[in-house]
Amino acid sequence: RRITSNPEKEFVYLRRHMQPEHAARALQAGIPGIATQREYRRYYPAGEVAGHIVGFTNIDDVGQEGLEYEFDYWLRGETGAKRVIRDRLGRVIEDVELVAPSRPGKILRASLDLRIQYLAYRELKKAITDNQALSGSVVVLDVETGEVLAMVNQPSYNPNDRAQFDASRYRNRAVTDIFEPGSSIKPFIVAAALESGRYEASSIIDTSPGHLRVGGRVITQDSRNLGEIDVTTILAKSSNVGAAKLALDLDQEFLWSSLSKFGIGRLTDSGFPGESAGVLNDPQNWRPVGQATLAYGYGLSVTSLQLAQAYAVLAADGVRRPVSMIMVDEPPSAERIVSVKTARALKNMLEAAVSPIGTGQRATINHFRVAGKTGTAWKAGVGGYSKDRYLAVFGGFAPVANPKLVAVVVINEPRGGAYYGGDVAAPVF
């Protein structure tokens, strides 16, 4: 039926990508008109460890996902053409002239460090299993170059196992899925406050009586009344009241601009297919309640990659570099976002946040000084926020004195009992 329905074709494929021994048996059957043609098939050595980054091709080697899709034109090359003379059986008997030369595909050097990629994959998979979580992502960036050294997601897929493909697993959650970041956004609220010139790390904020009223109603509260605390302690203790008071004291346009400069609500320009820009609403639409809730990570949304790039700004002494999935020959030009003074003040504050007095102490690493911030957010659902569905986040960098790596960990809907960012995401870091 396939042959008779395509009479204009010289041949039709009966089956492709057969194992050689199966093809040999088909030829041995001696059926007239049956022939074989050798084809090449992509093999991905890293398998599911790098599946979301590398992606895969279809049976004709056309990129369908990941770098295979984004750089298909680069990898593919061009088929040449020549004018020939054929006999009545269609066989080439003479080459007449070359019409267009062929061009081989070019080499593409991904930025991934497979050692870090494997470790990130292993630790994320363990965290998802241990915490009975729905999904998760880890992104690791090179502070000096903006290169993506690791990007892993769970659940994942193996591009070599086509029979087991599940389309729901293809999505690179680290660049496509947006989420409300919870308290992991607080460092950027504090950075805006310091840049305004109205606050310093030692400035005192009164968080009494432990909750905050806006518009006549309580919108947030801390785990306990922290009283008068400095800005450093706001981050270390993750005070919602303190962060909200800082945000409310800043001009709306200034606060929006500050967050936008960090990359919130903007594409990272990674070039990865399906990347989301996140959400940062126009400040003209803000109300006091919304401005306050921004300070502890509600009312705006980010991707894991965006959040990692934002933390990289603080790690890089206040400059923002474009992220790259491709290896760069030399560090790209950087854009200054905050002053060196502000960035270094944040480094010290974030180091306090992972100290024994902070919420992120489980992110500490022996023999290394690390800095970072936890985040825990209720997930939105039908009718409002669900009180039993959480997102756990940790963003940080190391070593503090001269940061080399930035990492963001996101664990979606942990259901193993623990759900705070400090308990679920920080240990992965």
Language model features with spans:
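Small/polar-residue-rich segments within soluble enzyme cores
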Residues: 2-105, 408-409
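A helicase ATPase "motif cassette" and its flanking acidic/Ser/Thr-rich regulatory loops
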Residues: 120, 234, 429
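Flexible, solvent-exposed loop/hinge segments and secondary-structure transition points
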Residues: 30-31, 61, 116, 124-145, ...
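Conserved, well-ordered alpha-helix/loop/beta-strand core segments that scaffold catalytic motifs
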Residues: 10-11, 93-136
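Short, charged, low-complexity patches
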Residues: 64, 68, 113, 117, ...
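Short, small/polar residue-rich loop motifs at catalytic or cofactor-binding pockets
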Residues: 79, 132-135, 206
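Beta-lactam-recognizing serine transpeptidase/beta-lactamase-like catalytic domain environment
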Residues: 86-99, 112, 138, 142-183, ...
